[in-house]
């Protein structure tokens, strides 16, 4: 096997880890030229040896300047490889990703810069590493070093551009990672996540709406964030999805209804209003699809009828009337017993309006389903 030390002149390797940036930069340019010649000659064994040397002797070095030099070198090698770079990505990208968690802020900065330069060369070919890159960027978005945050932001923009133009991106593989990250409370990470949701939703070939139940609760969670900007971004994303739901013939109302019912009793007013507004639209749009969830929906609506916020009371009353107006049949899954239990429970409510509406429901059930109700009373 070829040794990279025989391929790269000692002076280049020495300057690659020099403390002076100019020397490192010039060494990288020389390295790029050497790799370019090897690529033209088709000598991929020597190219692999060079990449291996940069990874093992530089990016894995205990010395920070060596690690920086290794990152610069890997980016330079990729630039030198140009169209041949894709076949070496399995060697090139992992050490750069590892450097994202380096204790030295400058090394993390150089890792962002290196991956940026690598991504510019290989474009869509690096999509195979997307989840790992996304995970790294997610953490770097909240980095303690402002320079690292800035570099990560530039890289993030490039990655978004590449993903939106790529036909290799797998939304199915990405969603579990997104779902896992949605519970993070850090404001920078939350902005990062909403930014990605918005960008992916704007791509015609990516069906984010189909996966909305996987991250809907996370978006609702952001509505009560202490940052006005994050609340606004989450609200904007939710508004866009609700509009898409109105225009979509097939939506999984059930899974989302479960989430909305939980959020309708949130201590945060804005979250309650948004949840009850969604429930209102779902009742209008979903109709009989929501029959199995009627009791849960009613359980969320009745307390909101007496909410201290007038906007919430208005929407809750309207939703209550919509719900009562839908034709129901126990044979189609309408659970008379569950509706009755909710209504009886709300008879003990401290709020008069809620108690009155609960009585209306019991009266309505007696008219439409007398036998079933009498068995339960």
Where are these regions (language model features)?
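A generic tandem-repeat structural signature
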Residues: 65-139, 144-149
């Amino acid at each position: 096997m070829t040794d990279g030390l025989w391929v790269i002149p000692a002076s280049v390797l020495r300057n690659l880890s020099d403390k002076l940036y100019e020397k490192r930069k010039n060494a990288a340019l020389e390295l790029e030229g050497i790799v370019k010649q090897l690529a033209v000659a088709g000598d991929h064994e020597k190219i692999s040896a060079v990449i291996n040397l940069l990874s093992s002797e530089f990016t894995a070095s205990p010395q920070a300047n060596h690690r920086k030099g290794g990152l610069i070198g890997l980016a330079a090698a990729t630039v030198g490889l140009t169209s041949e770079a894709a076949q070496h990505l399995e060697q090139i990208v992992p050490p750069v990703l590892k450097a994202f968690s380096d204790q030295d802020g400058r090394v993390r900065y150089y890792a962002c810069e290196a991956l940026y330069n690598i991504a510019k060369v290989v474009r869509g070919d690096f999509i195979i590493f997307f989840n790992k890159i996304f995970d790294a960027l997610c953490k770097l978005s909240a980095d303690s070093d402002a320079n690292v945050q800035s570099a990560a932001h530039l890289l993030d923009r490039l990655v978004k551009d590449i993903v939106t133009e790529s036909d290799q991106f797998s939304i199915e593989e990405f969603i579990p990672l997104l779902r896992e990250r949605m519970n993070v409370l850090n404001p920078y990470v939350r902005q990062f996540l909403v930014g990605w949701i918005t960008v992916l939703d704007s791509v015609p070939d990516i069906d984010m709406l189909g996966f909305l139940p996987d991250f809907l609760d996370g978006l609702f969670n952001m509505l009560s964030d202490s940052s006005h900007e994050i609340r606004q971004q989450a609200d904007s994303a939710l508004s866009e999805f609700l509009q898409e739901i109105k225009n979509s013939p097939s939506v999984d109302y059930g899974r989302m209804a479960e989430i909305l019912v939980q959020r309708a009793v949130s201590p945060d007013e804005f979250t309650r209003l948004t949840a009850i507004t969604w429930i209102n639209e779902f009742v209008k749009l979903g109709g009989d699809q929501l029959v199995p969830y009627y009791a849960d929906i009613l359980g969320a609506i009745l307390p909101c009828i007496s909410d201290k916020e007038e906007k919430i009371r208005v929407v809750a009353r309207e939703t209550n009337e919509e719900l009562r107006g839908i034709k129901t049949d126990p044979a189609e899954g309408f659970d008379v017993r569950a509706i009755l239990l909710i209504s009886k429970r709300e008879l003990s409510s401290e709020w008069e309006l809620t108690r009155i509406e609960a009585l209306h429901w019991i009266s309505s059930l007696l008219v439409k389903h007398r036998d079933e109700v009498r068995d339960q009373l």
